[in-house]
């Protein structure tokens, strides 16, 4: 497999083409750093999806969502209230440590589907608002009404066969899907689209980006991709 270029999340933030996009990227940096600085959040929130592709693999197509997975089931340390409280507390600390002057607060959270034991693959959905301190937008943020938000989709009871450490700085990192798991996840998504009679061109674009950039994937890596795909399908099922 081709060697992956080194990356720096601060470079990604500074490469923003507009002021609004830079604020969004600063908020992403703040959220990821907040998760990295909390031992329980870091151990259980595995980054995947478009934001990982953007930061780690230089994709230019992504939404204002951050996707995470964990093999843990609902209950114990993994509850809607527990995750929200831990993230909010860690955000307060990280807002002060980073020099962006940007505040971030969890504005809402919910469990989907509902808090019913029959749903074995729920997600914790959160919306994190952000605004620069000293602005009128910050007043709206403090009342949890910021129009500028980042959605977090935290999937529980998901297979995470191969993970790696995504470095945020010299001291901290966040756990993330490996390249093989990202490719396997995209293939699983395509299989789901057939069964659900839906189409998402974004997944095809992402697969093309990864395969073009790392086209010399050897048989060992192909085997890891297949094993990851089988684990994902076995854990949640093709219809999951």
Model-found features: residue ranges?
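Compositionally biased terminal segments of proteins
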Residues: 1-240
